[in-house]
């Protein structure tokens, strides 16, 4: 396990840190530049634009998938054959690779022949993938279709762990459905929801494959997220120094958010 961690984590991160404070020229020649790459990034409008687009996309995804996942989980039967069948069907989108999801939605939104675009055009509404708003809506729908299942499964598992005695007590008190949700189910789901929000933030913040296949970062730079900037810088332009610095900042953001949520999860688990 230690060897796997070393190969998959420590060594790549060490190389990224090395690249982030060096500049390369004439092949494998590196010179020390200190924090120059970081200063250049933190004064770049392109970097800030991509960064805030990534944050905005994560916020949009969480605001859609968490409430939707809770609602669907509440509507599912807790026992019986139908319960098992629904869980299997709901899990299917999670089994589809990201690149396949991107191509599926690319085909669905093709002008004139795509199922989504032609259906909306039939209603008299223009479905133009050159419109940034339409593209963002499409990306949100695609991600929600792919990943809301994860939130549903987590919430469903959390609901199944609520003792029946809580529901019986609420029934005796004459509590309404909303009251049961607010005072019984939601408090018991807080730990699960923290985990769900963390997982969905990380995955949506680093989204690359589906978005790139569907939009190529366009129209313009409207869907050019930080992951696209990183790939463009490090692998297309082969600018290892700037790419390394961007990777470090990227990783620090994810680590800081993960630490905050991990602290909340530990506190919640300890009953604080």
Predicted regions: what they are:
Residues 1-272:
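A structural signal for multi-pass alpha-helical bundles of membrane permease subunits
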